[in-house]
Regions:
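Short amphipathic alpha-helical segments with coiled-coil-like heptad repeat character
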Residues: 2, 161-169, 214-223
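Polar/charged alpha-helical tracts
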Residues: 5-6, 10, 73-77, 229, ...
Length: 240
């Protein structure tokens, strides 16, 4: 069979487009193992992430939202501020209000607001998650299309630095084998650093020899006689 040049060109374009489609499909499907792990990409929504999961995922309609909570591991209660150097549990949940998608995915990070650097460290991720680094940014993400919508990891707060913002991207995956039928949502949570106030004890009796106007409480150290004036009966420094 003889093919003219026009027919051959069309065949070449068809083959090129088909191969590109296969490559794209493979790339998107393989990201179910985590976009940081597969593509070295940050999709958390923080300033350095560039773009979101909407770049590849869409078409779904689940009323998707993302919840971020940081828990005290001892009480199990959500915290509203953190103590430097303490360990907490970061939980990310992908919620839906319309239907139940078969799979879920997520990616999250923690950033110091003042410096845009990593805020603390992650450790001991839950069974459906993994830890990655993208361009130096610590990433916590799903390790496979997850049947559970809940993801968790231990977070150790930075030793200092002020406010910390957690960024999380979540996916409700309508079709676990492709990027179609998915819906993305993002969320942030900002926690301030606990302001530690050190109270100074001292003598709060203003007639004492060692009176300390800066003392927050009396520590029983007041000394009256060492500076007493002869004839001063009430310790006010004057002869009565």
């Amino acid at each position: 069979m003889h093919l003219n040049r026009t027919t051959m060109t069309r065949l070449q374009w068809t083959l090129t487009l088909a191969l590109a489609g296969i490559a794209t499909s493979v790339a998107l499907t393989s990201s179910s193992s985590g976009v940081a792990q597969v593509q070295n990409a940050n999709r958390t929504g923080e300033l350095g992430s560039g773009t979101t999961c909407n770049l590849c995922h869409g078409g779904g309609s689940f009323g998707t939202s993302v919840d971020i909570v940081v828990l005290d591991p001892n009480s199990g209660q959500a915290i509203t501020q953190y103590l430097p150097g303490e360990q907490y549990v970061l939980e990310v949940a992908v919620q839906t209000s319309q239907g139940t998608p078969p799979r879920y995915g997520m990616q999250a990070t923690a950033v110091l607001d003042a410096s845009s650097t990593n805020a603390g460290t992650f450790s001991e991720p839950s069974a459906n998650t993994q830890l990655e680094d993208v361009g130096g940014r610590h990433i916590f993400e799903h390790n496979a299309a997850s049947a559970s919508n809940a993801f968790s990891v231990n977070w150790t707060a930075p030793l200092e630095g002020g406010d910390v913002t957690f960024y999380a991207a979540g996916l409700a995956a309508g079709n676990p084998t492709s990027a179609g039928g998915d819906e993305y949502a993002g969320a942030t949570l900002t926690l301030p650093e606990v302001e530690v106030v050190i109270e100074i004890g001292g003598c709060t009796y203003d007639f004492a020899c060692n009176y300390n106007a800066q003392a927050a409480f009396d520590d029983g150290s007041c000394e009256i006689t060492s500076c007493a004036v002869e004839g001063d009966l009430d310790g006010d420094g004057n002869v009565n």
